[in-house]
């Protein structure tokens, strides 16, 4: 399984990359806004840190505007993946960019059928949002299983990026289901490495070491 980091915070990206945990990065307008920096400036800096797919989202909601934005974003670096909304116009743009050889990540997916449509349009990645489904008392992980089954049934090439991850259990369930990628907030990445028995074991080893004659 590949891990993407879901942030536009360059400091977090550097730290996670140093841990060897970052195969790619996903950003969105909300994350960029939190950084307080210019969009292109942030994206360029990220491409200099991580050698992997960097998802950058368009703002336009209609096909021609999406294509114009995508064309400019794709010029920044070969690793740029264009993030498009799961709408009819987004699907049209996905198809256009597929024909031009530009990679896409269709986002804000909440049903298996939306994922299927995105894959048929030529999306490189599909991003179902599990946490937001959980928030409205639906089972977010259930759609990951359904998407995995559909894609396997038909040999679809689109990779599943599990998004809106809130806790380590989301990552565990994604791995068990066979999702291709989890895009994870840095805080959750750090939680993956923690367990109280690990800390207790280290403490015990150090206490025992102090008893060894020096």
Swiss-Prot record:
Alphabetized GO MF terms: aldehyde-lyase activity; transaldolase activity
GO cellular component: a single term: cytoplasm
Key word Transferase present: yes
Primary localization: cytoplasm
Pathway annotation from the record: Carbohydrate degradation; pentose phosphate pathway; D-glyceraldehyde 3-phosphate and beta-D-fructose 6-phosphate from D-ribose 5-phosphate and D-xylulose 5-phosphate (non-oxidative stage): step 2/3
Enzyme active site: 83
Enzyme class: transferase
Cell compartments where the protein resides: Cytoplasm
Enzyme Commission numbers on file: 2.2.1.2
GO BP, one annotated term: carbohydrate metabolic process
Domain of life assignment: Bacteria
Keywords of the record: Cytoplasm, Pentose shunt, Schiff base, Transferase
Family designation: Belongs to the transaldolase family. Type 3B subfamily.
Stated name of the protein: Probable transaldolase
Organism of provenance: Geobacter sp. (strain M21)
């Amino acid at each position: 399984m590949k891990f993407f980091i879901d942030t536009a915070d360059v400091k977090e990206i550097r730290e996670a990359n140093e841990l060897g945990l970052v195969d790619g990065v996903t950003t969105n307008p909300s994350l960029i806004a939190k950084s307080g920096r210019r969009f292109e400036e942030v994206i360029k800096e990220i491409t200099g840190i991580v050698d992997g797919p960097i998802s950058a989202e368009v703002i336009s909601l209609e096909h021609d505007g999406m294509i114009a934005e995508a064309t400019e974003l794709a010029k920044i670096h070969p690793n740029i993946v264009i993030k498009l909304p799961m709408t009819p116009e987004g699907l049209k743009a996905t198809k256009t960019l597929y024909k031009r050889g530009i990679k896409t990540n269709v986002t804000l997916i909440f049903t298996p059928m939306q994922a299927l449509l995105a894959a048929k349009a030529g999306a490189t990645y599909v991003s179902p949002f599990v946490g937001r489904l959980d928030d409205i008392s639906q089972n977010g992980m259930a759609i990951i299983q359904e998407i995995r089954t559909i894609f396997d049934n038909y040999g679809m090439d689109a990779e599943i990026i599990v998004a809106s991850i809130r806790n380590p259990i989301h990552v565990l369930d994604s791995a068990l289901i066979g999702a291709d990628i989890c895009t994870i907030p840095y805080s959750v990445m750090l939680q993956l490495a923690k367990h109280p028995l690990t800390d207790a074991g280290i403490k015990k080893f150090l206490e025992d070491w102090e008893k060894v004659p020096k």
